């Protein structure tokens, strides 16, 4: 496999190097507690990590192969099993949320933001209200990054989401390496992610900005098959399904088949299921049941889990890749699940 030279706009790379922390402080952190001492870049067939002790930065080469990235995947998967002291016994849902939120800032009008820069590691993006609670995912991945310092933060966060979906029973997610960590100044503006209190028009506006059509929007919101909301983080509370650590199409089934009512409580307006009052739906979720075109796709996914898996895989892979300047010839990889 041919290794590459760091030739992607070397002058730009050199400027980024001046932003890199010193190699002697591998655990240095910003306000959010997760700035590692390596700035990683990946292109072609290899991954590079480098450090700067002076303006004249040194470059260290690591020729990472697919097998090396599989080791990162496996380490995340193993830790998901070993470290079960989190919501419903799994960090998987919050890893998916980290990957989703890191990528969902993309703006197709100027091809900026998205997962490429790994800027969720900095306080400005990490402190956006929509990202409350994601410190748990970043801290979960911190020892993985220390073990594999050559992988960029953007690649690690997105690979964490891929691992979560696959290890919790979801579809295989095609993935590409090559995200280049950017300095804090590259952080996206607040307000780029969906506001869960809104309706169909807002959903379309946010996802259209990223280049998604109605079908892709509905598939991506199906990520709510996993996890739960926390009042202290978002103002909403509860899981969407009875199996929040299993990736299924139950989200759509429950949304369309159950009866829902407004929850009477002191948090943000949300829906609860009439029968058990233990499940929740967000106003943006309910838009999938009330908007004619959204409902068409939600109904299709409720009836056919294989179709949902296929469409989610394609849409989520697209989301992870949006805004990334992959070197020409970068391969698309699929990783073998540990639970296979």
From Swiss-Prot:
GO terms for cellular component: mitochondrial intermembrane space; mitochondrial matrix. Its EC number is 1.11.1.5. Transmembrane segments: none annotated. It comes from Yarrowia lipolytica (strain CLIB 122 / E 150) (Yeast). This is Cytochrome c peroxidase, mitochondrial. Its main location: mitochondrion. Forms a one-to-one complex with cytochrome c. It is found in: Mitochondrion matrix; Mitochondrion intermembrane space. The record marks 97 as: Transition state stabilizer. Residues 1-17 form a transit peptide.
